[in-house]
């Protein structure tokens, strides 16, 4: 446990920030997995496109705000785009 008042405050701040970061990353994981499930179940193209767009928007937002590294966001977007393109071609 922290011995100083400022250290206690830093601990509280880091716990809040850690929880916020975890929740945002979890939202992203859910969006990506939802899109992949939709593709696996051969859902309608329009539904998959909406899921794709929301996942890409979330990736952009998290990358710009440094919740995840910008390169990781770019790599994930590329993977999702390839997955989406292969799904569209298959139909």
Curated annotation (Swiss-Prot):
Composition bias, Basic and acidic residues: 1-18
Swiss-Prot/TrEMBL GO biological process terms: translation
InterPro entries named in the record: Ribosomal_bS20, Ribosomal_bS20_sf
Location of the region described as Disordered in the Swiss-Prot/TrEMBL record: 1-26
Cellular compartments per GO CC: cytosol; small ribosomal subunit
GO molecular function: small ribosomal subunit rRNA binding; structural constituent of ribosome
Function: Binds directly to 16S ribosomal RNA.
Pfam families: Ribosomal_S20p
Protein name: Small ribosomal subunit protein bS20
SUPFAM superfamilies for this protein: Ribosomal protein S20
Keywords annotated in UniProt: Ribonucleoprotein, Ribosomal protein, RNA-binding, rRNA-binding
Taxonomic superkingdom: Bacteria
Protein family membership: Belongs to the bacterial ribosomal protein bS20 family.
Gene3D superfamilies registered for this protein in UniProt: Ribosomal protein S20 (1.20.58.110)
């Amino acid at each position: 446990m922290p011995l100083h008042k400022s250290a206690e405050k830093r601990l509280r701040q880091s716990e809040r920030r850690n929880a916020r970061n975890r929740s945002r990353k979890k939202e992203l994981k859910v969006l990506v997995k939802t899109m992949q499930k939709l593709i696996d179940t051969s859902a309608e193209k329009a539904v998959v496109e909406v899921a794709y767009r929301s996942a890409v928007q979330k990736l952009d937002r998290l990358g710009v705000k440094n919740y995840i590294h910008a390169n990781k966001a770019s790599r994930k977007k590329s993977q999702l785009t390839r997955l989406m393109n292969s799904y569209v071609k298959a139909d």
